[in-house]
């Protein structure tokens, strides 16, 4: 499968699925900002809402959402945080910044976590960490692979150390997933930064990125202000990270469903051969 470990294209193109049949919208979709028209959001330069992304990936009527009732509180009584949560709920029509569940992609079962950039820029607080951890634990229980679509500005500052703790919690859960011999695919979208990059985003067995996605810890402006130097053109973009070996493959949105289905199938068939 490895084509050129020192080149920009580390994986050969997988063409197990060649048809152009489109996915259907999951039966539990919301009418909201984060669930726009999946077709209109397939353009690479437009950030994609979580519901639209699920609609573009998951087979019709197969998505079962986990923990949809969980919502953020204000554990540290951070000023105006409660108001920001309510505003984010109203604009996104979601309770927090990640949707988790299970379904099939071209018949291949998986647990899917999709971060929602429409909710406080996908920042990771206690609810995000808890939902992702529970989803991973469910995958271990059901012996299913995990796919996480990352889109985040980082840890949610209004929750302080409780937010930072989610980095360790999600990473530990992924460690248990690996010990169980299960696949984890991380998909990095624009932007993937901060504490999410420093935890589960970069722990995938296979790390995929969308074209042109901003991926890093601190943002480019912060780095430039700190080191007082101009960064190279394209620094922290997915193409730069592929060239430097930090990610495995860049996949466009139109090819994402087929690529993920093929990887899931290869892993499943490989597991069956060694069972």
From Swiss-Prot:
Stretches the record annotates as Disordered: 23-47
Organism superkingdom: Bacteria
InterPro entries referenced in this protein's UniProt entry, alphabetically: AcCoA_carboxyl_beta, Acetyl_CoA_COase_Trfase_b_su, ClpP/crotonase-like_dom_sf, COA_CT_N
GO molecular function: acetyl-CoA carboxylase activity; ATP binding; carboxyl- or carbamoyltransferase activity
Matches recorded under Pfam families: Carboxyl_trans
Residue ranges constituting the CoA carboxyltransferase N-terminal domain according to the UniProt record: 18-275
Record field: compositional bias (Polar residues): 26-38
Localisation: Cytoplasm
This enzyme's EC code(s): 2.1.3.15
The protein's role, per its UniProt record: Component of the acetyl coenzyme A carboxylase (ACC) complex. Biotin carboxylase (BC) catalyzes the carboxylation of biotin on its carrier protein (BCCP) and then the CO(2) group is transferred by the transcarboxylase to acetyl-CoA to form malonyl-CoA.
Complex formation: Acetyl-CoA carboxylase is a heterohexamer composed of biotin carboxyl carrier protein (AccB), biotin carboxylase (AccC) and two subunits each of ACCase subunit alpha (AccA) and ACCase subunit beta (AccD).
Family: Belongs to the AccD/PCCB family.
Protein name: Acetyl-coenzyme A carboxylase carboxyl transferase subunit beta
Biological classification of the source: Bacteria, Bacillati, Bacillota, Clostridia, Peptostreptococcales
Record gene name: accD
């Amino acid at each position: 499968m490895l084509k050129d470990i020192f080149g920009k294209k580390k994986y050969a193109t997988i063409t197990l699925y060649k048809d152009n049949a489109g996915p259907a919208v999951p039966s539990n979709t919301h009418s909201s900002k984060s669930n726009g028209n999946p077709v209109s959001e397939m353009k690479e330069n437009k950030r994609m809402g979580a519901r639209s992304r699920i609609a573009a990936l998951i087979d019709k009527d197969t998505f079962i959402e986990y923990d949809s009732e969980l919502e953020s509180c204000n554990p540290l009584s951070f000023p105006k945080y409660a108001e920001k949560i309510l505003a984010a709920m109203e604009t996104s029509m979601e309770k927090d910044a990640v949707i988790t569940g299970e379904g099939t992609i071209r018949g291949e079962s998986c647990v899917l976590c999709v971060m929602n950039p429409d909710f406080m820029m996908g920042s990771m607080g206690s609810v995000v960490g808890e939902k992702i951890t529970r989803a991973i634990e469910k995958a271990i229980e059901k012996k299913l692979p995990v796919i996480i679509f990352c889109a985040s500005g980082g840890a949610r500052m209004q929750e302080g150390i409780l937010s930072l703790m989610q980095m360790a919690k999600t990473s530990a859960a992924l460690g248990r997933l690996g010990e169980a011999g299960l696949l984890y695919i991380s998909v990095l979208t624009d932007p993937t930064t901060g504490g999410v990059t420093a935890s589960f985003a970069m722990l995938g067995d296979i790390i995929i990125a969308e074209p042109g996605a901003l991926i890093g810890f601190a943002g480019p402006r912060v780095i430039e202000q700190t080191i007082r130097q101009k960064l190279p053109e394209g620094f922290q973009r997915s193409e730069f990270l592929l060239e430097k070996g930090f990610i495995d493959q860049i996949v466009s949105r139109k090819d994402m469903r087929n690529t993920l289905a093929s990887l899931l199938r290869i892993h499943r068939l490989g597991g069956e051969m060694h069972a």
